[in-house]
From Swiss-Prot:
Organism the protein comes from: Mus musculus (Mouse)
Motif (PP1-binding motif): 61-64
Domains as described in the record: The N-terminal region is required for binding to PP1, the central region is required for binding to glycogen and the C-terminal region is required for binding to PYGL.
Record note on quaternary structure: Interacts with glycogen, PPP1CC catalytic subunit of PP1 and PYGL. Associates with glycogen particles. Forms complexes with debranching enzyme, glycogen phosphorylase, glycogen synthase and phosphorylase kinase which is necessary for its regulation of PP1 activity.
PANTHER family assigned to the protein according to its UniProt record, in alphabetical order: PROTEIN PHOSPHATASE 1 REGULATORY SUBUNIT, PROTEIN PHOSPHATASE 1 REGULATORY SUBUNIT 3B
Induction: Up-regulated by TITF1.
Modified residues (Phosphoserine): 260
Ranges of residues in domain CBM21: 124-232
GO biological process: glycogen metabolic process; negative regulation of glycogen catabolic process; positive regulation of glycogen biosynthetic process
Role played: Acts as a glycogen-targeting subunit for phosphatase PP1. Facilitates interaction of the PP1 with enzymes of the glycogen metabolism and regulates its activity. Suppresses the rate at which PP1 dephosphorylates (inactivates) glycogen phosphorylase and enhances the rate at which it activates glycogen synthase and therefore limits glycogen breakdown. Its activity is inhibited by PYGL, resulting in inhibition of the glycogen synthase and glycogen phosphorylase phosphatase activities of PP1. Dramatically increases basal and insulin-stimulated glycogen synthesis upon overexpression in hepatocytes.
UniProt protein name: Protein phosphatase 1 regulatory subunit 3B
Expression sites (tissue/organ): Highly expressed in liver (at protein level). Expressed predominantly in liver. Expressed moderately in heart. Expressed weakly in prostate, stomach, thyroid, lung, kidney, spleen and skeletal muscle.
């Protein structure tokens, strides 16, 4: 945009007063300067930030091979190897190990009788009646070990285990060793035994033993109520069946529906009754 500026000089000479000087200023073609103070948008002025433009997510698409002209399945055919595979595992060794393991399990032995001391009342009655009774017995590494309780009838005494490995075609007596009692003055003595079992035992033969106690020229036996203490193979162990009824004397005891005795005098005759309590001395 052109700007005309006129100047008049009245104080100049008369010859120059009539002359006018005209200056014409044309604008520059350069871009105008930006102001140094910039006003933000209404959102920035109010403290709010304009949300960023969300990118458009590309939807996933599933395409199958048959849509692209390919096969859905891939078949691979393997041919036999020319050289045999070197398999480190031999199937024959596996079968031999299985057979040996089965044989070892079948040749393992177990006790075919309960621990005598598990039923303390029966154990005490047998000890008082027979003066000798097997207390405990265990099997360990082709050996049998246990303890025997005897009544202290005399100082000199001999305790031995009479055992057979061929159904009493022959037998062997193994002496027991005296075990010092912790409590002095007891009327019972303890003996221990440790017997090694043979390497080869025929499957049709029975292993049995009984306990013999010799004192004052007499022999007392504990033969497990006439059945002997049997050691049998694990596969031939007798299954627990019905408990044999007790054929001993009847003390007038009646049992309830749960098998508990209604009268304790027959099972525990040494327990003092209420009527005779004042006439009895101390129990020890």
């Amino acid at each position: 945009m052109a700007v005309d500026i006129q100047y008049s000089y009245s104080s100049m000479a008369p010859s120059l007063r009539r002359e006018r000087f005209t200056f014409k200023i044309s604008p520059k073609l350069s871009k105008p300067l930006r102001p140094c103070i910039q006003l933000g948008s209404k959102d920035e002025a109010s403290g709010m930030v304009a949300p960023a433009v969300q990118e458009k997510k590309v939807k996933k698409r599933v395409s199958f091979a048959d849509n692209q002209g390919l096969a859905l399945t891939m078949v691979k055919v393997f041919s036999e190897f020319d050289d045999p595979l070197d398999i480190p595992f031999n199937i024959t060794e596996l079968l031999d190990n299985i057979v040996s393991l089965t044989t070892a399990e079948s040749e393992s032995f177990v006790l075919d009788f309960p621990q005598p001391s598990a039923d303390y009342l029966d154990f005490r009655n047998r000890l008082q009646t027979n003066h000798v009774c097997l207390e405990n017995c265990v099997l360990k590494d082709k050996a049998i070990a246990g303890t025997v309780k005897v009544q202290n009838l005399a100082f000199e005494k001999v305790v031995k285990i009479r055992m057979t490995f061929d159904t009493w075609k022959s037998f062997t007596d193994f002496p027991c060793q005296y075990v010092k009692d912790t409590y002095a003055g007891s009327d019972r003595d303890t003996f221990s035994f440790d017997i090694s079992l043979p390497e080869k035992i025929q499957s049709y033969e029975r292993m049995e033993f009984a306990v013999c106690y010799e004192c004052n020229g007499q022999a007392y036996w504990d033969s497990n109520k006439g059945k002997n203490y049997r050691i049998t193979r694990a596969e031939l162990r007798s299954s627990p069946g019905k408990i044999e009824p007790y054929n001993g004397p009847d003390f007038g005891i009646s049992f309830d529906q749960f098998g508990s005795p209604r009268c304790s005098f027959g099972l525990f005759p040494e327990w003092p009754s209420y009527l005779g309590y004042e006439k009895l001395g101390p129990y020890y």
